[in-house]
Regions:
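Short beta-strand segments within Ig-like beta-sandwich modules, predominantly Fibronectin type-III
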Residues: 97-104, 180-186
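Exposed aromatic-hydrophobic patches
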Residues: 105-113, 153-155, 188-195, 216, ...
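Short acidic/polar inter-strand loop motif in beta-rich domains
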Residues: 2-11, 124-131, 176, 206-216, ...
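Acidic glycine/proline-rich low-complexity segments
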Residues: 2-50, 133, 218, 254-335
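Short, small/polar-rich motifs associated with maturation and membrane association
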Residues: 196, 201-203, 208, 213, ...
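Beta-strand-rich binding/interaction modules
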Residues: 1, 72-96, 117-124, 151-181, ...
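Low-complexity, Pro/Ser/Thr- and charge-rich linker/hinge segments at domain boundaries
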Residues: 11-12, 19-53, 58-60, 68, ...
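Edge strands and adjacent loops of beta-rich recognition modules
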Residues: 45-70, 132-147, 162-164, 315-341
């Protein structure tokens, strides 16, 4: 509901669990306050000390991580209140207007000159303005990832004295290498057939032989066979009398497998923003930074709006699991704890 949207919105500065949400950061890490709420019983409100004047925030996210001089860059943006509620409106830059298409997010293109410093303006539907400065454009590597009809196109452009033949591109999923390409020109495109990739978050990274990362981008691959429910239940009515016998028809795959069944009163069901299915939780929510509100929305349909919203989510909340230099260069890291010899 709209009321819950304002009271229980995600905040990147808070801590989250898959089981329940921790709304206020504990003061003491060793003995955290038990300042939690059973949401069925009552609402939760922030501590008075956390209340502050609402302010508009505009954040810019250059695709790949950096704004690169002399080449075309895509920049995602997110316009929200400081408590996380998103805004509707348009971003204005260089005479162009770009709408916020999903949860205050959108994307625009720019070809900056080296050292260029400019501001962009976001105007809300009710006429409020908020501005933000573009990062200073430097020489480096611009990375763009786009989905075509049945493949993913990765475009790499270098700017400045970088030697292209020292750069490499990897595509990984859950830490497993899926593609490995050597970059041998200042402008290069690679096409990855979608049927060679698995469902879930993939990480495209451009780095050199020393392990220095120049660009990094997350993108999400959808698979209909994964998203389609393997079981269908028929025969559920809107209402039942107390202790009334129920007969349901379950159909699905022919393979024999154990199935768990859970029955609850739909009247007591509370609509939450954390409405992810097991698939959405494993493939999406657990793979990116921060709480993802209403993750089930991205998988309700396979249309352009949801694909665009999913890609904007990757460009704004996407993050790297580890530092590539630490993992790639010998001597950059050492074990601080011995390996466990049994289950924890």
């Amino acid at each position: 509901t709209e009321t819950m949207e304002k009271e229980f919105f995600r905040d990147f500065e808070k801590l989250y669990s898959r089981v329940f949400v921790v709304y206020d950061r504990p003061k003491d890490q060793e003995h955290p306050e038990r300042n939690m709420t059973s949401r069925i019983m009552r609402r939760y409100y922030k501590n008075d000390m956390d209340l502050e004047e609402r302010k508009l925030q505009l954040t810019l996210y250059p695709e790949g991580g950096n704004l690169v001089a002399g080449v075309e860059n895509c920049v995602a943006f997110e316009a929200v209140w400081n408590d996380g509620e998103w805004l509707e409106g348009y971003l204005h830059f260089g005479g162009d207007s770009v709408p916020a298409v999903h949860r205050g997010r959108g994307v625009f293109t720019v070809t900056p000159e080296k050292g260029m410093e400019r501001e962009v303006l976001f105007r809300t539907r009710d006429g409020q303005d908020i501005s933000a400065s573009l990062p200073k454009a430097e020489e480096g590597v611009a990375l763009q990832v786009r989905r075509t009809e049945d493949a993913w196109r990765i475009r790499i452009q270098t700017s400045g004295p970088l030697s292209p033949d020292s750069l490499l591109l990897t595509v990984m999923r859950e830490g497993v290498l899926k593609e490995y390409k050597r970059i041998d020109s200042t402008y290069q495109e690679f096409t990855l057939a979608e049927d060679t990739l698995e469902a879930g978050v993939h990480q495209a990274t451009v780095f050199d032989t020393q392990g220095r990362v120049y660009a990094d981008r997350l993108f999400f691959v959808r698979k209909k066979e994964v998203e389609t429910a393997s079981l269908q239940v028929e025969g559920v009515r809107e209402e039942y009398a107390p202790y009334e016998r129920m007969e349901l028809s379950v159909s699905g795959q022919k393979s024999s497998t154990p199935i768990s069944v859970s029955i609850r009163d739909g009247y007591m069901h509370e609509t939450l923003y954390d409405n992810a299915s097991i698939m959405a939780e494993m493939l999406l929510s657990s793979e990116i930074h921060g709480f993802v509100p209403d993750p089930g929305w991205y998988f309700e349909e396979d249309d352009e709006n949801r694909r665009q919203g999913l890609d904007l989510l990757m460009m704004t909340q996407g993050w790297r699991r580890f530092k590539w230099r630490d993992m790639a260069v010998k001597g950059e890291w050492e074990l601080t704890e011995t390996a466990e010899k049994a289950q924890v």
